[in-house]
Amino acid sequence: MATATIALQVNGQQGGGSEPAAAAAAAAAAVVAAGDKWKPPQGTESIKMENGQSTGTKLGLPPLTPEQQEALQKAKKYAMEQSIKSVLVKQTIAHQQQQLTNLQMAAVTMGFGDPLSPLQSMAAQRQRALAIMCRVYVGSIYYELGEDTIRQAFAPFGPIKSIDMSWDSVTMKHKGFAFVEYEVPEAAQLALEQMNSVMLGGRNIKVGRPSNIGQAQPIIDQLAEEARAFNRIYVASVHQDLSDDDIKSVFEAFGKIKSCTLARDPTTGKHKGYGFIEYEKAQSSQDAVSSMNLFDLGGQYLRVGKAVTPPMPLLTPATPGGLPPAAAVAAAAATAKITAQEAVAGAAVLGTLATPGLVSPALTLAQPLGALPQAVMAAQAPGVITGVTPARPPIPVTIPSVGVVNPILASPPTLGLLEPKKEKEEEELFPESERPEMLSEQEHMSISGSSARHMVMQKLLRKQESTVMVLRNMVDPKDIDDDLEGEVTEECGKFGAVNRVIIYQEKQGEEEDAEIIVKIFVEFSMASETHKAIQALNGRWFGGRKVVAEVYDQERFDNSDLSA
């Protein structure tokens, strides 16, 4: 039918149409005719598509292998995560731009008759002053230092929103200065007080306020005056494993506390490493600042200072970090969905692989889902954060996902066979007096007064047992020879397997004639061997010297920090 129609059209146009048009019509008719003559080979099936048409042949695809299916699921998960991140970033940027636009419009309208109400005008001025107070100028930066180094040095004072380094387009290097913007003004104030003239990359950096602070100085002074009415202090560089109650128990040694709150991330629910404490008396806040600033709590040096702004809930974003509430809710829902999918996928895989009576599925599933967070002991020196080394394999714990019912996780029968053996092993490893506390007992421990800091430190240090022993006051620098390392290795080998021995000479000053002390570090394969060696060697006399044997922090040792 199509061939006949086109042929009629061609014949109808032969008289009055042009030759190119006739040739094109004839070519089209030939193509259609060829299509009508072609038939699919026998034995093939047609596939009917959504638009009603059918394909001539069925393209058979091989089934996916289990590895390909797993890779496909991972790709889908990654795509979903990236989509969530993209949406959150866009919403956050739009939210911040809207706030900036509102402030700019407020400033413009205030310059032309001020149609805003007095309360709105004051709020806009205070927001602008707070934004300026969150920024610090950093000058005299060595040209080889990058943004990562600046961030690492200034991060202990509080979360950094942005670092703006000015770059030279000709030399492709920065111009030696930068602006660091924090989330809260107190972080910028602490950085200003403690980082000015600090040696960084061989130079003494200069830290000060931006040059445009002058126009906001009256509002800043007013905020500082209002802050004096509240006995609040700012605490930063808080260990991630510490809770509000832990910090409160440590700081209430200086006086009665009215409130203690750590700022939290709305997406993860974890605190952001800083918070505010309000005392009933001004003297208590002063004592806390003078005593707790640069206090080593769990391997991180606390940064403590007076609050420079009053509590202003009306002027702060609805959610911490400036994230819109809708974005926070969306992120939480998406995260829960991904977690649920992981739980279902993990349960399905284990259901096909597990052998009844041999391995408990709950113990197997604990590795990807329920690994406990490792303790972070991450400071070589005040203001410097080092890398994190996992302490030991995570303890298997089954954590059920919200909204997901998994029959495999519910009371496996083989778990009861393994528990008596586990209890017997614990009895052999730990005497009754030295048995470690259960995690639930540690979470509800009650500590206060002067011993609070010691108790919190013990709670943190229990999570990572060190295998390193340090021997002090054992030899003089002049007594060091080639045989000393072998002698120490042989002597300490009586208590366990020695991985390595390091003899470290530490100079106690910059002067040429400064005293040099010798530390000998011995790393064992197990923490129990370390404790056994310390008990045997501590207090022993060696060459007329009384040896001091102590446990050395594992994280410092792993990061080659032998200065403690």
Swiss-Prot record:
GO terms for biological process: apoptotic process; mRNA processing; regulation of alternative mRNA splicing, via spliceosome; RNA splicing. The modification Phosphothreonine is found at residues 65, 319. The third RNA recognition motif, called PUMP domain, is atypical and may rather mediate homodimerization and/or protein-protein interactions. SMART domains: RRM, RRM_1. Homodimer. Associates with the spliceosome. Found in a complex with RO60 and Y5 RNA. Found in a complex with FUBP1 and far upstream element (FUSE) DNA segment. Interacts directly with ERCC3. Interacts with CDK7 and GTF2H1. Interacts with SRSF11/P54. Interacts with ARGLU1; interaction may be involved in ARGLU1-mediated modulation of alternative splicing. It comes from Mus musculus (Mouse). Keywords: Acetylation, Apoptosis, DNA-binding, Isopeptide bond, mRNA processing, mRNA splicing, Nucleus, Phosphoprotein, Repeat, Repressor, Ribonucleoprotein, RNA-binding, Transcription, Transcription regulation, Ubl conjugation. It is found in: Nucleus. This is Poly(U)-binding-splicing factor PUF60. It holds the Pfam family RRM_1. Residues 134-212, 231-309, 467-554 form the RRM domain. Residues 1-521 are annotated as: Inhibits homodimerization. The lineage of its organism: Eukaryota, Metazoa, Chordata, Craniata, Vertebrata. There is a cross-link at residues 48, 85, 424, 463 (Glycyl lysine isopeptide (Lys-Gly) (interchain with G-Cter in SUMO2)). Residues 82-564 are annotated as: Inhibits transcriptional repression, interaction with ERCC3 and apoptosis induction. One of its GO terms (molecular function) is RNA binding. Residues 37-61, 421-442 are annotated as: Disordered.
